[in-house]
Amino acid sequence: LGKFSQTCYNSAIQGSVLTSTCERTNGGYNTSSIDLNSVIENVDGSLKWQPSNFIETCRNTQLAGSSELAAECKTRAQQFVSTKINLDDHIANIDGTLKYE
């Protein structure tokens, strides 16, 4: 599963969207984007792989290293805490296109 960072480069996060240049099976490259909002949830200040809308309660999203989504997310107590989730766990490069698996 996942492991997009092994074959994708120049990755960046803007809001909830991951964009990367990914290798294709024919040797070429394709720029691809995926909205992580549909697959990641904020659970009391912690990012989890669940369909939701994390961006409504998280801020300052960025890519940490080559594959981690870092953000400040709101807890039930309404305080923002730092959290990360490894996108390589479920985001894959399928012939130049970023996909959730």
From Swiss-Prot:
<dbReference type="Pfam" id="PF08881">
    <property type="entry name" value="CVNH"/>
</dbReference>
<dbReference type="GO" id="GO:0050688">
    <property type="term" value="P:regulation of defense response to virus"/>
</dbReference>
<keyword id="KW-0930">Antiviral protein</keyword>
<dbReference type="InterPro" id="IPR011058">
    <property type="entry name" value="Cyanovirin-N"/>
</dbReference>
<feature type="disulfide bond">
    <location>
        <begin position="8"/>
        <end position="22"/>
    </location>
</feature>
<comment type="subunit">
    <text>In solution exists as a metastable domain-swapped homodimer which very slowly converts into a more stable monomeric form at room temperature. Under physiological conditions it is unlikely that the dimeric species exists and indeed the monomer is more active against HIV. Interacts with HIV-1 gp120.</text>
</comment>
<protein>
    <recommendedName>
        <fullName>Cyanovirin-N</fullName>
    </recommendedName>
</protein>
<keyword id="KW-0430">Lectin</keyword>
<dbReference type="InterPro" id="IPR036673">
    <property type="entry name" value="Cyanovirin-N_sf"/>
</dbReference>
<comment type="similarity">
    <text>Belongs to the cyanovirin-N family.</text>
</comment>
<keyword id="KW-1015">Disulfide bond</keyword>
<feature type="disulfide bond">
    <location>
        <begin position="58"/>
        <end position="73"/>
    </location>
</feature>
<dbReference type="GO" id="GO:0030246">
    <property type="term" value="F:carbohydrate binding"/>
</dbReference>
<comment type="function">
    <text>Mannose-binding lectin.</text>
</comment>
